[in-house]
Amino acid sequence: MFNQNGKIFDPQVKDKIVCKEIKRQAPIYEVKYEEFEGTNGSRESYASFRPFELVLTFDIFYKNEYDKELIVSELHQIFIPGFQYYVTHELSPGKRFRVNPVNFELTEEENDYSTIEITFDVPSACSESLSTTLSEFNLSNEWQFSQNLEAADYKYSFDVSRFQVFNAGDFAIDPREHALKITLQGESLGNGTIFNRTTGDRFIYYPEFSTNLGQTVTLDRVYPKLNGVHCGINTNLELITLAPGINEIEIQNVANVKSTWDFRYLYK
């Protein structure tokens, strides 16, 4: 399935365009080292996961050369729209890949069919869960085995001040790079605080706010908002990140507190 700017569709057409193989490159872990005179070996200075490739192979069937040309032209329009988009495939139905097409090649050509190989770069170096944490958790098409989901009742809406937020992905969620939306409601006389004890991150909203008066504080990626209006000047300008696994969260200086945590898991 393809998701191009919200338009979701299957590029396959029965007896005409058929995906016959999906190959995903293994994670690429790049490590750089520094060497110091007089010491043994090298010291790791930098390490990161690098972009990898996703390759889809299609068979196309046609009646003649004119029919073939029409199909190939149509596939050019589909696969190379000129912007990044998401690909989901049946081998990992609970994950999606944000891709850029980099190669479109006819690898085999016959009188009535051809084989086309399309290579995509995955620049983020990760896949992400098809659904966000505020969707229901069950092993349907949106969630699958191998997504680090245990037999547990995962919650991402809370009405207590101390709780755990579980990040089932392989990577930390950093709002400077990834979508993370936190909403905070309740009654505060000032200095309402979100504290992640696991990472040490602390976000503070200094003024009073009251949900009884219709006010909600939101952290939408890197943007603090009060009822949708940017309010970063009234904060400590810090962010909340989520480490892989369990994050111990504490909400301070807010009575009758309610909070929600919406994000996607990220996988190697």
Please identify what each model-predicted range represents.
Residues 135-268:
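Intrinsically disordered, low-complexity segments enriched in serine, threonine, and glycine
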Residues 69-76, 115-117, 132-137:
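"Short basic amphipathic alpha-helical interaction patches in structured regions
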Residues 2-4, 121-126, 134-142:
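Mixed-charge, glycine-accented linear interaction segment located at domain edges/termini
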Residues 48-52, 79-81, 110-114, 174-176, ...:
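Solvent-exposed loop and beta-edge segments used for protein-protein assembly and interaction
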Residues 1-51, 93-105:
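Solvent-exposed edge beta-strands and adjacent loop segments
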Residues 8, 63-103:
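Short, acidic/charged, Gly/Pro-enriched secondary-structure junctions
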Residues 84-128:
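Short beta-strand and beta-hairpin "edge-sheet" elements
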Residues 41-66, 112-126, 247:
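Oligomerization/assembly interface segments of phage tail-like spikes and tubes
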